Design a protein with these regions (language model features):
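Membrane-embedded alpha-helical bundles of multi-pass integral membrane proteins
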Residues: 132-384
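Reductase modules of NAD(P)H-dependent flavoproteins
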Residues: 341, 432, 450, 455-459, ...
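Primarily EF-hand calcium-binding motifs
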Residues: 47-62, 85-110
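Amphipathic regulatory helices of Ca2+-sensor modules
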Residues: 63-83, 107-113
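EF-hand and EF-hand-like Ca2+-sensor regions
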Residues: 74-75, 91-163
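Ferredoxin-reductase
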Residues: 394-477, 547
């Protein structure tokens, strides 16, 4: 190991105040002037000298080319970057040219211990005008304005449940059976009425074709939060659980014991006719058709609910060994089909009620018939449509991180909006599994494309099959079927003039389609000359955060294309963040940062992503990013679209709420749900 990069690593764990300040350079890139080539070059010279100043030199205080190259290779390895020998040699020559241009020789004595703060624009510290600070509203108003569509739907649902419960409660409060069972009876029957209602509407949020069709209506889409369909499905499921506990629990612990132990005189005078004038025992009622169907429904729903829980579906490895064997996405998917049996049992259960003599009182079928017909119609439509789509694979490519890119023919009549997704099936892996993937092609493209990252059993099998076929140069690639398109949150970007698109890892896929669509709009005749796209979009900010350098290969060609087509119009701004690199200002990344800035200034290509989009280090400082947007777009409405893990999603949603309270700019948050 040379003395140069030995000293580099020995000094890499010491910090100065000035160096840490430079970490703010990438935190608010949206306000950086694009014409900063001279500043970059000057700052990169300082960064190179700071990084190399920690290296020992020979007696003449010279750095050799070998020393610099080894320092570059070590710094690259320290930051988990892939760097070839040829690239290291190129960057070494770049440094030598820069030093020779700056001083005429490679002596570094007397070099200023500066930082990269030359790049920091003064507008970062520009305060928000006082008149806008005075426009802050109360937290309640801001919350209501951001969530009013969710609020009214939830309120209407709660009102409907409460009204049905109260109506049935009061009805059975007047029955003769009340004398035997007391308030247990109306409580159980009130809960049963809410169960009928919730068992009906729980199907509607998963009728994806119907939702996609309704999204086309601006008036309907403006008042119904279709993006929250899965959340509402879960909310109604929670209502079903509460209803089961009240209905089943009250029957088993209160109603049935009171019937079995009722005074024979009171029993004969009140409800004997409902039981064939025979007072049943506890077990006789439990083992009756009504009892067994009810218990069977509870058991099946319990299995489905447990296998649909987040630990079971997303992280089965954290579960006990016995449960782990049956957990995962497949268990969730197949167990949900138990509800076919549940609905059959529900109808049977409702036809053998003890205390309901008239057919008019057996109303369960009235609640569920329309939702069940819609759902079954959707399933039939999906089967027919997927069989009619003749989509052939034109090209398949594998990327680092076990990502598979598929480019397919576009079926006739297949129309979609950017941000939508499709379900994909690979019959050679499973004839029954369909998985959702965002389209990464634009609506105007003559093909369809998707990117599949291996995150589960199905995707691993699909990746391995294609990887093996490509390795053997086999022209007979595995076949896939598609179903869709389906609406998603990202397609609502067209509602805004300014959008902020945030993707983590493979979560960038829906926004790649959006960016390509915007670039296509910029090319269309009718695109205005005042930096607007054809659909009225004025500005799109795209933030992509990933852990591995190889991830940039997934969309490298697309980002180059989008950057070139956007050109000088400046409608699209893209920012890549690589979290494996130490933050800017850290000595461990200073040499890489300096080379990156110098290479970008000379060639316009980022050395990390190999695209015209500069890569920033570590993670974005989201509060600074949002504050920068608020200052730049005072009084405007910004659509924030996010696809990635829930933890950051909650953080960004809270940040939007906070910014809406503290600034005059309104941030509207949208998150992808599959």
């Amino acid at each position: 190991m040379s003395a140069c990069y030995l000293h580099l690593v020995m000094s890499s764990y010491s910090y100065s105040v000035g160096e840490n300040e430079s970490a703010s350079l990438a935190e608010e890139p949206i306000l950086v002037n694009q014409n900063i080539t001279r500043s970059i070059s000057r700052s990169s010279s300082h960064g190179i000298r700071i990084a190399l100043d920690s290296c020992e030199r020979n007696s003449s205080s010279h750095l050799t080319e070998k020393d610099i190259k080894q320092a570059i290779m070590f710094s690259s390895s320290l930051n988990k970057l892939s760097l070839s020998q040829d690239e290291a040699t190129e960057y070494t020559h770049l440094i030598l040219e820069e030093i020779q241009t700056g001083q005429g020789l490679t002596k570094l004595s007397g070099t200023r211990k500066g930082t990269l703060n030359d790049l920091q624009p003064t507008c970062w510290s520009t305060p928000i005008p006082t008149k806008h600070i005075q426009c802050m509203t109360s937290a309640a108003i801001v919350f209501f304005r951001a969530h009013w569509r969710r609020i009214w739907v939830i309120v209407m649902w709660l009102v409907a449940c409460a009204a049905l419960f109260t109506w049935k409660f009061m009805q059975y409060r007047q029955r003769l059976a009340f004398e035997v069972m007391g308030y247990c009876l109306p409580t159980a029957k009130g809960a049963a009425e809410t169960l009928k209602f919730n068992m009906a509407i729980v199907l509607l949020p998963v009728c994806r074709n119907t939702i996609t069709w309704l999204r086309r209506s601006r008036s309907i889409n403006s008042v119904i939060p279709f993006n929250d369909n899965i959340n509402f499905h879960k909310l109604v499921a929670a209502g079903i659980v509460i209803g089961i506990i009240l209905h089943g629990g009250t029957h088993l612990s209160c109603d049935i014991p009171r019937i079995a132990m009722a005074d024979k005189t009171i029993f004969g005078r009140t409800i004997a006719g409902d039981f064939g004038y025979h007072q049943p025992s506890y077990m006789e009622i439990v083992t009756s058709i009504e009892g067994t169907t009810g218990i069977a429904m509870v058991v099946l729903m319990l299995i489905a609910f447990l296998l649909a829980s987040r630990p079971s579906r997303r992280n089965p490895g954290s579960l006990p060994p016995l449960v782990r064997q049956i957990a995962g996405f497949n268990a969730f998917w197949y167990s949900h089909h138990l509800f076919v049996v549940v609905y059959v049992l529900l109808i049977v259960h409702s036809m053998f009620l003890y205390l309901a003599k008239d057919v008019s009182e057996k109303t369960t079928w009235v609640y569920v018939v329309i939702p069940v017909m819609i759902y079954l119609g959707e399933r039939m439509f999906r089967i027919i449509r997927s069989m009619s789509y003749d989509s052939k694979i034109l090209d398949a490519t594998t990327y680092p991180g076990k990502v598979l890119s598929l480019r397919m023919t576009k079926p006739p009549g297949f129309r979609y909006q950017s941000g939508m997704y499709v379900f994909v099936q690979c019959p050679q892996v499973s004839k029954f599994e369909w998985h959702p993937f965002s389209l990464t092609s634009a609506p105007d493209d003559d093909h369809l494309s998707i990117h599949i990252r291996s995150l589960g059993d199905w995707s691993y099998h699909v990746y391995d099959m294609f990887h093996e076929a490509l390795r053997r140069s086999n022209l007979d690639l595995p076949k896939v079927s598609i179903d869709g398109p389906y609406g998603a949150a990202s397609q609502d970007h067209s509602k805004y003039e300014i959008v902020l698109l945030i993707g983590l890892g493979i979560g960038a896929t829906p926004f790649i389609s959006v960016l390509k669509d915007i670039a296509n709009d910029l090319d269309k005749e009718g695109c205005t000359t005042n930096h607007h796209s054809a659909n009225g979009l004025r500005k799109a900010y795209f933030y992509w955060v990933t852990r591995e350098q190889g991830s940039f290969e997934w969309f490298r060609d697309i980002m180059k294309e989008v950057s070139a087509r956007d050109g000088k119009q400046g409608v699209i701004e893209m920012y890549n963040y690589l979290t494996s690199i130490y933050q800017e200002g850290d000595k461990r990344s200073m040499l890489i940062s300096a080379i990156q800035a110098l290479h970008f200034a000379r060639h316009g290509i980022d050395i990390i992503s190999k695209t015209p989009v500069r890569t920033h280090f570590s993670r974005p400082n989201w509060p600074r990013v949002f504050h920068g947007l608020a200052r730049k777009h005072i009084g405007e409405r910004i659509g924030v679209f996010y696809c990635g893990p829930d933890d950051l999603g909650r953080q960004l949603e809270r940040l939007c709420h906070k910014m809406n309270m503290r600034t005059f700019t309104r941030f509207v948050f949208h998150k992808e749900h599959f």
